[in-house]
Amino acid sequence: MAQVGDKLPNVNITVIDKEGQKSVAANEYFAGKKAVLFALPGAFTPTCSETHLPGFVVHYDDITGKGVDAVACLSVNDAFVMKAWQDTQNAEKIAMVADGGGALTKALDLVLDTADFGGTRSRRYSMILDDGVITHLNLEKGGDFEVSGADTILKQLG
């Protein structure tokens, strides 16, 4: 399982950000950046849409004001779903990471098995990355939403 000190692996993700949509290795996308990556079980789901993503949208300027170069949201959904969700959530400043086949989620060993809900999903978490290395990891238990929100990240950034 991912832990502080680990480097993001060389697995492909699709990123939708201000530069458009691109397929890129996770370690390459986050290289040379101080970044926040948060993950959630699914786009358009209640907690993810009502609380988790909106918190990062509201606090985006506060987070980037603390020296963060990128704020990214990961879900095991395809790029079309992530783009549609970005649009409906007014989250254009947030880089949406479509981990369609779950390659990054599996490589980090942060899989949430929701067979009855939608198959393999990501556990809910947030992390701070420095040049692709995890410096802080806030991992939720089960379906909880207690420690992975924007408020926690802001406290950790100081």
What do the PLM-derived regions correspond to, one by one?
Residues M1-G158:
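Chalcogenol-based redox active-site neighborhoods
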